[in-house]
Amino acid sequence: MEGENNMEKGLLLAKKEDSANTTPLLIFSTFIIVSASFTFGAAIGYTADTMSSIMSDLDLSLAQFSLFGSLSTFGGMIGAIFSAKAASAFGHKMTLWVADLFCITGWLAISLAKDIIWLDMGRFLVGIGVGLISYVVPVYIAEITPKHVRGAFTFSNQLLQNCGVAVVYYFGNFLSWRTLAIIGSIPCWIQVIGLFFIPESPRWLAKKGRDKECEEVLQKLRGRKYDIVPEACEIKISVEASKKNSNINIRSLFEKRYAHQLTIGIGLMLLQQLCGTAGISSYGSTLFKLAGFPARIGMMVLSLIVVPKSLMGLILVDRWGRRPLLMTSALGLCLSCITLAVAFGVKDVPGIGKITPIFCFIGILSFTMMFAIGMGALPWIIMSEIFPMDIKVLAGSLVTIANWFTGWIANYAFNFMLVWSPSGTFIISAIICGATIVFTWCLVPETRRLTLEEIQLSFVNV
């Protein structure tokens, strides 16, 4: 209780602070950190338009390609196991250097692959890299940004992911799958160099007892004229409170005091992966062909709209708030899945089946747009905000593993579900999207314009 009272006093001091400036260092640091998110997006979208050419060039069966497609998510699960612990022990920057090494090696292995072994190994290594990236990037951004722009800056993670998706969608129509793999590695090289010029997270420095460095970095991030004393005090009090709970273990996560945060974190990650995005992002070209719509046109249109819609989400996240944007996104996804279910459901019906191509196009287009403005980024943003420092490592690892494990299953199963029933597949997705609305309404709190410590204290006072 004493730690909680001290935190409340610190928050009273912090509330007196003015809005911090958005400094060049803050913008540059965010850009360098999210450059790896481009590789994350490229890995997600890589199989969407390369399926037929890879299967033809390397003589793969559907099962072999499905395994290849799912290996990035399996590798991501392995990376996720170590992501939070590595970031806590060695820092966010060092963890990202290791992630870049995995991604660069993996993309090169794919581009040079002569058989299924090198192809699968490369995909698995990329997966480990993006598994590390998936946790570190949103957490680092949340820890360096002031509360009034935290949502927008953290949303840039999703924006760069969508840029990666858009690039492989668009250039997949013209370039070979080997060249696309090389393109996927370029942002990692940028980050490898850029990490030398950005600071470590102030909260990580404070946790390691490097208080002077914490204050120096905080001053650089906020601007010379900004009074960092209230925020630095808030961070120190939070660190002190977490040290009093240093005996936290995996069992502690399931105690009543953490149940709400853990339910939100894991729940949103499961709903994100099961809403249908694994199939649409990875096998969009296959869906267009199945519906009789020109796959090249469909993929080019998707590549052009996904980034502008992400920009819309970036603008709205700190204006509307997390809850309204998440529920709006989930509603749009639900309607999109219903549209796709209808499109494939009437495909073989005489006289009505001709609407399948255009309905499929509308469904995939609207799904991609609605996912980009909310459901793609918000689970990661909320995950980076809700866990207190004493359980952030364990909870972050568990939540990230849950995301990747579910994604692996969904990605591998999608092709087989399409063989079973395209319409039935999207009916299931629509139900899950509807459940997301109810879940958000009942359990997810609004975190807009609150500091990380204020958010975490709000769960204590529930």
Curated annotation (Swiss-Prot):
For this protein, the record's Gene3D superfamilies field holds: MFS general substrate transporter like domains (1.20.1250.20)
Q: Name the Pfam families for this protein.
A: Sugar_tr
This protein's UniProt keywords = Membrane, Sugar transport, Transmembrane, Transmembrane helix, Transport
User: Member of which family?
Assistant: Belongs to the major facilitator superfamily. Sugar transporter (TC 2.A.1.1) family.
Q: What does this protein do?
A: Sugar transporter.
Location of this chain's protein in the cell: Membrane
PANTHER family according to UniProt: PTHR48021, SUGAR TRANSPORTER ERD6-LIKE 12
Name of protein = Sugar transporter ERD6-like 12
Q: What is its main location?
A: membrane
What stretch or stretches form a coiled coil here? Answer: none
Where do transmembrane segments lie in this chain?
25-45, 62-82, 101-121, 124-144, 151-171, 179-199, 262-282, 297-317, 326-346, 358-378, 399-419, 424-444
Q: Which SUPFAM superfamilies match?
A: MFS general substrate transporter (SSF103473)
Q: Which InterPro entries does the record cross-reference, listed alphabetically?
A: MFS_dom, MFS_ERD6/Tret1-like, MFS_sugar_transport-like, MFS_trans_sf, MFS_Trehalose_Transporter, Sugar/inositol_transpt, Sugar_transporter_CS
A GO molecular function held by the record: sugar transmembrane transporter activity
Q: How does it sit in the membrane?
A: Multi-pass membrane protein
Q: Name one GO cellular component term.
A: membrane
Family matches, as CDD domains: MFS_GLUT6_8_Class3_like
Superkingdom of origin: Eukaryota
